[in-house]
C-alpha cells in the first residue's frame, strides 16, 4: 500500500499533460478555415458558409481547450513555478513567430514601394489610389491603442499590488478601447476608395492592416477571458501567468501598429 502511495506522488516540478484531442481538432478546423478562405477568394458559392463554420468550430475548440488549461492551473495546481517558466518561454517564442509573420508582409510592402513596378507607373502609391490621411482615423486609432496599452499595464500593476477593483476597471477600459479601435478600423475599410484586388498597394495594405486587426480581435478575446477569470478570483498577486501572457501579447499588438502607422500610413503616403 505504501509503495503505491509513493509511486503516485509527483516528485518533479513539471506538468505531464494528459492526452488531449484539442490540438488535432483545432488543426482540422484551421484547415476548414483555409479551405473556406481559398474558395471565397475564388468566388465559389457557399464558401462563406464553410469559412464561418470553420471559424465557429475553432472558437469552440479554443473555449474547451482554455477551459482545460484553467482547470489544470487554478483548480488542480499543476502550473508550478517551473511550468510557468516554460510557458513564459513558450509565449515569447510564439510572439517571435508572429513578428516573423509580420516581417514577411512588411517586406512585400517595402519591396513594392521602394522599387515600384512598371504596372504601378513607377510611382508609389500607384496612380489612381486615393490613400488615407495618416492624421485622421489612423492617428486616432494610434492614440486609442496606446491608451489601451497603458490601461492593461495599469491593470497588471493593480493585480500585483492587490487592488482588485482597480484591476477589473482598468481591464474593462482596455477591452472597451480595443472594441472602439476595431470599430474605427472597420469604418475605415468601409470608406476606402480601393480594395484588396487593386494591385500591390491594395493587397499589401489590406493584408497587413487586416492581419493586425485579426490580432487585435484575438487579443480582445484573450483580455475578455482574463477579465472573467479576474472576476472569479482566479488570479492572485503571485500567480497570474494568464494575464501576463495577455499583457505581453497586447503590447506586441501595440508595437506592430506603431510600425504599421509610421511605415504604411505616414511614410507610405508620400
From Swiss-Prot:
Keyword Nucleotidyltransferase, does the record have it? no
Q: Which GO terms describe its biological process?
A: mitochondrial electron transport, cytochrome c to oxygen
Q: Which catalysed reactions does the entry list for this protein? A: 4 Fe(II)-[cytochrome c] + O2 + 8 H(+)(in) = 4 Fe(III)-[cytochrome c] + 2 H2O + 4 H(+)(out)
What Enzyme Commission number(s) appear in the record?
7.1.1.9
Any idea where this protein resides? Mitochondrion inner membrane
Membrane-topology annotation of the record: Multi-pass membrane protein
Pfam families associated with the record = COX3
**GO annotation, cellular component aspect:** mitochondrial inner membrane
Regions crossing the membrane = 21-41, 46-66, 90-110, 131-151, 167-187, 205-225, 248-268
Subunit record text: Component of the cytochrome c oxidase (complex IV, CIV), a multisubunit enzyme composed of a catalytic core of 3 subunits and several supernumerary subunits. The complex exists as a monomer or a dimer and forms supercomplexes (SCs) in the inner mitochondrial membrane with ubiquinol-cytochrome c oxidoreductase (cytochrome b-c1 complex, complex III, CIII).
Can you name this protein? Answer: Cytochrome c oxidase subunit 3
* Organism of this sequence: Cyanidium caldarium
